[in-house]
Swiss-Prot record:
Binding-site positions, Mg(2+) 2: 66
Species the sequence originates in: Francisella tularensis subsp. tularensis (strain SCHU S4 / Schu 4)
HAMAP family: RuvC
The keyword Repeat appears for this protein: no
Name of the protein in its database record: Crossover junction endodeoxyribonuclease RuvC
Keyword entries, A-Z: Cytoplasm, DNA damage, DNA recombination, DNA repair, DNA-binding, Endonuclease, Hydrolase, Magnesium, Metal-binding, Nuclease
Role played: The RuvA-RuvB-RuvC complex processes Holliday junction (HJ) DNA during genetic recombination and DNA repair. Endonuclease that resolves HJ intermediates. Cleaves cruciform DNA by making single-stranded nicks across the HJ at symmetrical positions within the homologous arms, yielding a 5'-phosphate and a 3'-hydroxyl group; requires a central core of homology in the junction. The consensus cleavage sequence is 5'-(A/T)TT(C/G)-3'. Cleavage occurs on the 3'-side of the TT dinucleotide at the point of strand exchange.
Length: 171
């Protein structure tokens, strides 16, 4: 199984790709899609193009994305929602089923506490994947999303008789 994690953002969208084989997690790739365009439609297209390129290179079999969180600034929430929507649509266009996780779920799965700091997430991602250095924040978050998805799907698979459809309902 190859899992693509996406940490959507209006300026930087992080991505992380892991491979799971024999219940072991292996690092494949990670990075950031840095948005350089000025107009909103071109910014959103840049996100879609970047994710499409990642899908074409790494051929993920599953995808996961962070759920939207509360914003004090309504415009910030709208921009993040647009980026997230484009990311989810691009994944769906490429026939990837998309699972969603809250920031708390992701931190809990990777660090062991839902209130973990960004630096703790970076450190645990580095440790779990055997990386020589901490990945950048957005890439670390995306890798953490992929790791969370693996742990979540592994746990759900243990539930006797849980099909892919019923697993989605359990969430």
């Amino acid at each position: 199984m190859v899992i693509l994690g996406i940490d959507p953002g209006s300026r930087i969208t992080g991505f992380g790709v892991i491979k799971v084989q024999d219940n072991k997690i292996y690092y494949v790739a990670s990075g950031c899609i840095r948005i350089t365009e000025i107009t909103t439609p071109k910014r959103l297209k840049q996100i879609a193009d970047g994710i499409t390129q990642i899908i074409n290179i790494y051929a993920p079999t599953e995808a996961a994305i962070e759920q939207i969180f509360m914003f004090q600034n309504p415009m910030g929430a709208i921009k993040l929602g647009q980026a997230r929507g484009v990311a989810m649509c691009t994944l769906a266009i490429n026939n990837l089923e998309v699972s969603e996780y809250s920031a708390k779920q992701i931190k809990q799965a990777v660090v062991g506490t839902g209130g973990a700091a960004k630096s703790q997430v970076q450190h645990m991602v580095q440790s779990l994947l055997g990386l020589s250095k901490k990945p950048p924040e957005d890439a670390a978050d995306a890798l953490a999303i992929a790791i969370c998805h693996y742990h979540s799907s592994k746990s759900l698979a243990k539930i006797s008789g849980a099909s892919r459809v019923s697993q989605k309902r359990i969430k």
